[in-house]
Amino acid sequence: MNVLLCSINTLKRLYDISAVEVGQHFYWQIGSFQVHAQVLITSWVVIALLLVSAILIIRNLQTIPAFGQNFFEYVLEFIRDVSKTQIGEEYGPWVPFIGTLFLFIFVSNWSGALLPWKIIQLPHGELAAPTNDINTTVALALLTSIAYFYAGLSKKGLAYFNKYIQPTPILLPINILEDFTKPLSLSFRLFGNILADELVVVVLVSLVPLVVPIPVMFLGLFTSGIQALIFATLAAAYIGESMEGHH
């Protein structure tokens, strides 16, 4: 009997873990529309962190940089290198866009692990990292799509559309489909990795709430940074591709 009760309790615990979900949505009702307030609030927090950090650094620039200025200069140099490698010699105007994507995604991903969002009490639902919501990642992917369309059209004009029938008109449907798969792959890759990371941490904390989840959390911080780099690199590559016309 004791063995049976133990087995039932174990199965019940596993069932509870299988139902784990990361966060509940917090909505604002605006007319007949429901807005994901969770995403807006946490995105504003991330944007505020970036703006405040930038203002504090640039208001007192020095010839011999201190730690903060030196760190930001290193980040800027890194983003320039990524942009130049993927876009080419005309990378200059696109550094702010690529840098904004990278920093926003990077800080958003890390905020999910480092900021105690769940401490903030809401009427219903709870806060989580912005990139933990598919709406954020799809919006970032659509911005990237608009950017590479603009890059191609601004450089080549209507001749940009010749790429859809190169090297042969038979590939027209595939080339059109590619414009839909690019934002889909960008958005779902980022969303899936961040969501999976948070789910793994939640499940491990439920099973072993002490030391074991800590290495996984550090691994999550590393993969979060890698995901930000991948997104920014692919965005720059798509922009460079649209300007050069290569597939």
Curated annotation (Swiss-Prot):
Cellular component per GO, a single term: chloroplast thylakoid membrane
Alphabetized UniProt keyword annotations: ATP synthesis, CF(0), Chloroplast, Hydrogen ion transport, Ion transport, Membrane, Plastid, Thylakoid, Transmembrane, Transmembrane helix, Transport
Record's subcellular location: Plastid, Chloroplast thylakoid membrane
Transmembrane region(s): 38-58, 95-115, 134-154, 199-219, 220-240
Classification via CDD domains: ATP-synt_Fo_a_6
Domain of life: Eukaryota
Alphabetical list of InterPro entries matching this protein: ATP_syn_F0_a_bact/chloroplast, ATP_synth_F0_asu, ATP_synth_F0_asu_AS, F0_ATP_A_sf
Entries under PROSITE patterns matching the protein: ATPASE_A
A Pfam family per the record: ATP-synt_A
Bilayer topology annotation: Multi-pass membrane protein
Molecular function (Gene Ontology), one example: proton-transporting ATP synthase activity, rotational mechanism
Function (record text): Key component of the proton channel; it plays a direct role in the translocation of protons across the membrane.
Subunit structure: F-type ATPases have 2 components, CF(1) - the catalytic core - and CF(0) - the membrane proton channel. CF(1) has five subunits: alpha(3), beta(3), gamma(1), delta(1), epsilon(1). CF(0) has four main subunits: a, b, b' and c.
Family that this chain belongs to: Belongs to the ATPase A chain family.
Protein name: ATP synthase subunit a, chloroplastic
Organism: Glycine max
